[in-house]
Structure formats: structure tokens, C-alpha cells
A protein has these predicted regions:
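Acidic (Asp/Glu) carboxylate-rich active-site/surface patches
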Residues: 85-118, 130
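Hydrophobic, well-ordered secondary-structure segments
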Residues: 73, 126, 147, 160-168
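Short polybasic amphipathic segments
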Residues: 98, 203-216
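Short histidine-centered catalytic/ligand-binding loop motif
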Residues: 53-67, 145-160
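Short amphipathic alpha-helical signal-transduction/dimerization elements
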Residues: 77-81, 151, 168-175
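N-terminal lobe of the biotin/lipoate ligase/transferase fold
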Residues: 1-86, 104-105, 111-113, 210, ...
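Short, acidic (Asp/Glu-rich) active-site segment that either coordinates a divalent metal cofactor
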Residues: 117-153
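Conserved, helical-rich catalytic subdomain that frames metal- and/or nucleotide-binding sites
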Residues: 156-208
């Protein structure tokens, strides 16, 4: 008999809704059905850590999509650093990938109502995270130096509930900071997190050769079309 997932302890305005199976399709259905902003859909899966948050923006899609994607990625990086092993090298590979020790561990994604114009305020905005607990090939972990998994990087004692709770706390902090202080602190944190993984990583020389310090801008249209990491966690 499958045990129900533990209840999440989330800061307001978030409230949890556990789902079975893939979170993103369920979250899209919930957003389209008019679920309240702040609803956090998540699963307690053994292979992937997935969550999605329904937001209600008050600015045009072109602005809020790029900001939401960056705030979500920053919150994931913050959460992984908080609940993981000390000094774990977490970094963001723009626009939407999350790396540990320069290996892809997952990413973030966004969605809005189809057909929303760039200068229109969307009825809802959905942000999601998808992280690999286990390697794509559990029989040969570490075979692919460009991909990794949380269990391989020392997160074996971390529960999905703990990681998602931490992510939600940091997401609220990042959103509040952005609403109060604008883009400046987001830009500073983005530069820090998109380069911090370069020092001491297993592929740091190659990363520096590619020019890691020059983080490209986030293209909201491209990100709304789908995540760049789609299919790479399988």
C-alpha cells in the first residue's frame, strides 16, 4: 500500500497539493481551471523531485516571464545550497538549467496562457522545477560527466518535502526582494549564481573557456516555448 506524502509546511501565501505522477501536466490543468495563486503542486517520487507554483502576475508577460524564471532558478539554487552538503557547487546555466559541480541535475520552466501577448498581463503564470534524484542510468552513475543526480552529489539524506519547503521559502524571499527593490538584487544574484559553479568544478577549465562570466539574457519567448533541458533527465 502506497503511503501518502508528508504534509508540507509552507510560508503564506503558498499551500501544497500533492499529486501522483508527473507534476507539470497536473499543474497546467490546475492553472487553466482557475486554481488559486500560491498553489504548490508536488510529488514524492523516488527518481525526480518535481514541483510547480501558480502565480498571479501584475505586469506584462515579457517582463514577468523572464523575472519569474530567474527568481525560480535562484530559489532552487538557494534551496540546494541550504539543504545539501556544505560547499556543494550549485550553479545556474542560463537560461533554465541547474548544475551541481558543473553536471546537469535539472532545471526550471515557465508557462502562461496560450496566446497571451507579450505586452499583456497574463491571467496566470506557472513556474516549475524538475531535479533528478537518481542518475538516468542507475547502474552506471557518473558515466556522463555532463549530467549528475542529487543522490550522487551527497543529497541522499534529503527528503523531497524538505527540498520543496526550502525552495518555497526562498522563492517567497526572492519575489519579495524583487517587488521591493526591483531588478538590481536579482541581477547581482544572477551573476553570482551563474558563475559560482565555475570555480573548482570538474569541468571548470572548459567553462571558463566558454566565457562563464558573461551570462546571456533570458529570452522569455524561448523559455515559454519549452525548457532547454527537456529530455535530458531521462
Amino acid at each position: 500500500m502506497t503511503r501518502p506524502p508528508p504534509p508540507l509546511i509552507l510560508p503564506p501565501p503558498f499551500r501544497a497539493l500533492a499529486v501522483v505522477g508527473e507534476v507539470w501536466p497536473a499543474a497546467l490543468d490546475a492553472a487553466r481551471a482557475g486554481s488559486e495563486p500560491g498553489t504548490v503542486l508536488w510529488n514524492d517520487d523516488l527518481r525526480r523531485c518535481q514541483a510547480a507554483v501558480i502565480l498571479r502576475p501584475d505586469c506584462p508577460l515579457a517582463t514577468c516571464a523572464a523575472s519569474a524564471l530567474r527568481l525560480t532558478a535562484l530559489a532552487v539554487a538557494d534551496a540546494l545550497s541550504a539543504v545539501g552538503p556544505p560547499n556543494v557547487p550549485v550553479a545556474i546555466a542560463p537560461p533554465d538549467r541547474i548544475e551541481i559541480d558543473e553536471g546537469l541535475v535539472g532545471g526550471v520552466r515557465i508557462a502562461a496562457p496560450p496566446g497571451t501577448e507579450a505586452d499583456a498581463v497574463p491571467a496566470w503564470l506557472l513556474v516549475g522545477i524538475d531535479l533528478a534524484w537518481l542518475a538516468a542510468d542507475p547502474e552506471a552513475p557518473g558515466r556522463d560527466p555532463w549530467r549528475t543526480a542529487l543522490r550522487e552529489e551527497g543529497f541522499g539524506d534529503v527528503a523531497a518535502a524538505d527540498l520543496i519547503e526550502s525552495f518555497c521559502r526562498y522563492l517567497r524571499h526572492r519575489i519579495n526582494e524583487w517587488e521591493e527593490a526591483g531588478d538590481a538584487p536579482v541581477e547581482a544574484a544572477w551573476r553570482q549564481h551563474t558563475t559560482s559553479g565555475a570555480a573548482g568544478g570538474r569541468l571548470s577549465a572548459a567553462r571558463r573557456a566558454r566565457g562563464a562570466d558573461a551570462a546571456p539574457p533570458v529570452d522569455p519567448a524561448a523559455c515559454l516555448a519549452g525548457p532547454s533541458w527537456a529530455g535530458l533527465l531521462e
